[in-house]
Each structure stands twice: as C-alpha cells, then as structure tokens.
Amino acid sequence: MDGRASRWQSHREERRRELIKSARKAVHALGSDASMEDIAAAAGTSKSVFYRYFGDKAGLQQAVGEVVLSQMQRRIQEAAQSAQTPREGLFAMVSAYLQMAETSPNVYTFVTHYTPGDAQATNGTIATAGALGHFFAAISDMIARPMRSHLGDGREAVIGYWPNAAIGLVRNAGEQWLASPASPSKPDQEAMARQITDWLCLGIAPELRTAAPNQTSPTTAPTLSEPKKEST
C-alpha cells in the first residue's frame, strides 16, 4: 500500500470511529429504537454516510457492539482478577456487568438486540452472533478457567455446562432488572448483583427452607420419581 492509499485508509478508519462514537451518543439520548435518519441527524451528517460505512442499521449495531462489548469484557475481566475467592469473583463480574449496562440501558439494548426487521426473521430472539457471541464466549471461558483449577479433573460436565447456564441466568435477570421501572421493590445495582450471585451459588434453597409452614413440605410433595398416588 502506497502513502496515499495508507493515508486514505487511515482517514476512513478515523471517520468510522467518529461515526461509532456519535451513534453511541445518539442512541444513549434517543433510545435503542432510534432510526438511522435520527442517528445521522444527531451526528450532524446524512444517513447515506452511515450506510456507506456500515451498510445498514444491523451493521451499525455490530460496529457499536464491538466497541461497547469490548469495554464491558475488559471491565468484567479486571473485576474478576481482583477477587480473592470464586464467589467474590462471581459477584465482581455480575456487578461489573450490571454497572456497565446501567450506564446506558439504551446503548446496551441497541447492541444486544436485533433491529425490528431482523427480529421478525428470527422470531424476536436476542442476538447471539458476531460481537455479542464472542463476548459471551469470552465471559464463559473467564468463568470456566478458575472452575477448572478449583474443581480439578473429572468435572468436565460441570465445567462445560455451568458457565453458559450462569450467563443465561445473569443476562435474563439483569435485563429484566434493567427494563423494570423504578419502584420501592426494585433492588439497587449492588443488591441485585448480590441476589444474582446468591442464586448462582445457592439457588433458591434458602427461600425454600424458610417457606411458610402451611405450604407443602418438600419431603411429602410428589416427585418425578414418585408420582402422587391416586385415591381409591
């Protein structure tokens, strides 16, 4: 590549970074469903410029997602590395995730969900490909590494399945919390992070042990292995 071509490439990369930054600010202010026209207007340019650099809205979501999710991944990794125990590590990671998402729910939703057209084609499922897929794969590996050293050999099934299951719990609970309007019953970020960490480590066993006395006892309730007997 000659000097002129190199300068042009550098200019395009810089312009692309500027557009991503402007789009992020616009989405933060306007909402996750902001149109390309609205985003371009907020950025002080035309939507044709955004189409030229990103192709379509999904391409812009992908580009913004690469930046946002990379920052989230670094923050979560730093939080995990500062922990002294596995449980502290989980809490630190969950807390960092919620903090980053809470910083701008609009931007978080913009980079983790398909555009309306794409959602219709995929039955409205949440995006898990591209930058988002890489993000969750990296977080899963981040969880699995200390588990492997802590649990030792012979626990491949736990190490293989649990990190992804944990991510599903954290993400779904976190997104529901993020979308919930403020109310006296809504926990703050730290309380929500601790609650999710407790669910990851203990499940809902503590709540079951403190169930009301008139509720069915787990020892007498029918189970899958012991069906309820029919009365004669």
Task: Please name every model-derived segment.
Residues 1-42, 59-62:
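Basic, helix-initiating cap at the start of DNA-binding domains
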Residues 19-27, 68, 72, 97:
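Short hydrophobic clusters on alpha-helical segments that form packing/core surfaces
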Residues 64-90, 112, 121-122:
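Amphipathic alpha-helical linker/stalk segments
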Residues 1-14, 147-148, 153-154, 208-232:
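N-terminal intrinsically disordered/low-complexity leader segments
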Residues 58-71, 111, 132-135, 139:
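Alpha-helical DNA-contacting segments of helix-turn-helix folds
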Residues 43-54:
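Short hydrophobic/aromatic patch on the recognition helix
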